[in-house]
């Protein structure tokens, strides 16, 4: 599924985006963000992040730097919740 979604974005980049004026208000561009989000977070969450980003790409939003959030390490969360009891 990831390959299909990324392939669709790459088709957009190659056959549509390059022939239209640059209008993305963000860096990285929304299409580059979408690819990175899907690669980092998978098809479902990555698509959600990409759609959320695209919905902000309009003239009434200031835009700017907006990077894909890093993937949370599930092991890091569980390490904090484990308590070790020392018996004396």
From Swiss-Prot:
Recorded GO CC terms: plasma membrane
Please list which residues make up the signal peptide.
none
What keywords are assigned to this protein? Cell membrane, Membrane
* Membrane-topology descriptor: Peripheral membrane protein
- What is the role of the protein in this entry? Could be involved in insertion of integral membrane proteins into the membrane.
Q: Which named protein is this?
A: Putative membrane protein insertion efficiency factor
The protein's predominant localisation is membrane
The record's subcellular locations are: Cell membrane
């Amino acid at each position: 599924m990831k390959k299909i979604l990324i392939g669709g974005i790459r088709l957009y980049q190659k056959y549509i985006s390059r022939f239209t004026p640059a209008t993305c208000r963000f860096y990285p561009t929304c299409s580059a963000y979408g690819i990175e989000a899907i690669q980092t977070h998978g098809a479902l969450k990555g698509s959600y992040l990409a759609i959320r980003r695209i919905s902000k790409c309009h003239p009434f939003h200031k835009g700017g730097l907006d990077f894909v959030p890093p993937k949370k390490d599930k092991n890091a969360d569980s390490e904090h919740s484990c308590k070790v009891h020392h018996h004396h």
